[in-house]
Amino acid sequence: MSAEDTIRKTVTENDVVLFMKGTKMMPQCGFSSRVAGVLNYMGVSFADVNVLADEGIRQGIKEYSDWPTIPQLYVKGEFVGGCDIVTEMTLSGELDQLFEENGVAFDKDAANKIREHNA
């Protein structure tokens, strides 16, 4: 299976996917750690793909999304963005709305605490 096929399969078979450096339990870069941390704190169930484990996936995901950086978050097959975008969406409440619209379970109280802490 090609890297593109693997990426497409992963994105379509999981409601929420984070392509990241490292894993959700052991991130290996600050940006990946931040996004995984937000998702974990909000109680979101997500698949993590360690791009450091496969060079084909690492390069392929950048082509698949036409986005040059890692991490990359996908919700219901759609590319959401990287660390800066996910952070902005978390603080504005847009990420909550995206999860709600797509039937993704998350802890609303935790999301509110993130916003309160960063106000």
Predicted region positions:
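Acidic/histidine-enriched, glycine/proline-rich intrinsically disordered or flexible terminal extensions
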Residues: E101-A119
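Local sequence-structure signature of Cys/Sec-based thiol-disulfide redox active-site neighborhoods
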Residues: I7-S45
